[in-house]
Every structure is written in structure tokens, then in C-alpha cells.
Amino acid sequence: MMNISGPREGDFITIKSYKHDGSLHRTWRDTMVLKTSENALIGCNDHTLVTESDGRRWITREPALVYFHKHYWFNIVTMIRENGVSYYCNLASPAVLDKEALKYIDYDLDVKVFPNGEKRLLDVDEYEDHGNKWHYSADIDKILKHNVRVLVDWINNGKGPFSKEYVEIWYNRYLELSRQQ
């Protein structure tokens, strides 16, 4: 995911999601990079500007850690709220990072995890509609369904971003770097 001239800890990047047809779906400004490795990127944003494909703009309400991995067809947004931590997991292509932004294709399906641990698979109808409209291949469908199972396994077993330590470690690192800015 990274190259030598890529962003470093404390740098800010833009995140762009696209749809399968190549159209821009959504843009997040100003996500602080907390960690990069050959395979993954962890970042955080708080009250960042989001621009929708139709031009609407809004500001996020709470701090959110973001996790992208080059081998998995999902990304994970950890929302840190007063009533607890919740997760919004996008089924999406592995992200690529270039000089402009971190980019991925959003494949509509989402898994939401509530602070009480309840899980919900969202936007199944949207996935089916877009799959028909844009002709998602059988391979894409198989990959995404497999990655839903991987993601649920991570959730059930507290792996990676779903571990208790993840939020504490990475949100504290974000606060520390923010104080240095």
C-alpha cells in the first residue's frame, strides 16, 4: 500500500470512495495518518469535511479511526462516541494510495456493529440493485461474500480494529500527535 514517498505519521490525507462504474461516491478531507505498513494504513479524523457525489457537504460528528488493508475487501471505521464505540465496516476493494488520495471502490454492503455488540448487515438491496446495474461479476460477488465472513469472524473474535486495545492505542496516539501540530 505504501511507497517510499508516501505519507508519514502525522500527515493528513484525503480518502475517496468510488462506485463500481468509476464515479466518485464520497470524499473525506483531513484524515491524519497514524500508522502505515506494507499492507495497512490506520488513520483518524474528527469533525472532518465529507463531500457527497451530489455536492452535499457535512462534517463528521465524532472522532473516527479508519483501517484499510491491501489484502482484504473491507475497510473499518471505528466511531468513538459518548455512548460507546461503534463500527461501520464497508465491503470495498482493497484501497490504493496515490499522491492525490487513498482510494477504494465501495461495494454497497456494510456491517454495522453497535456498542452493545449487535451486528447488522446493511444495504443488501442496494448491493443487488448496483450489482445488476453495473454487472458485478460472479468473482466479485464470491470475494465480497467471503470477506463478509472474514469480517464477522474478526468482529466475533475481537481481532484487529475490534480488539479492546486498538481504540485505546490508536485514539491516544491521535491525541498525542494532534497536540504536536
Curated annotation (Swiss-Prot):
Belongs to the Ntdp family. Its cofactor is Mg(2+). Keywords: Hydrolase, Magnesium, Metal-binding. Has nucleoside phosphatase activity towards nucleoside triphosphates and nucleoside diphosphates. The active site is at 26 (proton donor). It comes from Ligilactobacillus salivarius (strain UCC118). The lineage of its organism: Bacteria, Bacillati, Bacillota, Bacilli, Lactobacillales. It comes from the Bacteria. NCBIfam families: PRK13662.1 (NF010183). It is an enzyme of class 3 (hydrolase). It holds the Pfam family DUF402. Signal peptide: none annotated. This is Nucleoside triphosphate/diphosphate phosphatase. InterPro entries: DUF402, FomD-like_sf, Ntdp-like, SA1684. Mg(2+) 1 binds at residues 90, 106, 110. Mg(2+) 2 binds at residues 108, 110, 123, 126. GO terms for molecular function: magnesium ion binding; nucleoside diphosphate phosphatase activity; ribonucleoside triphosphate phosphatase activity. Its EC number is 3.6.1.15, 3.6.1.6. It catalyses: a ribonucleoside 5'-triphosphate + H2O = a ribonucleoside 5'-diphosphate + phosphate + H(+); a ribonucleoside 5'-diphosphate + H2O = a ribonucleoside 5'-phosphate + phosphate + H(+).
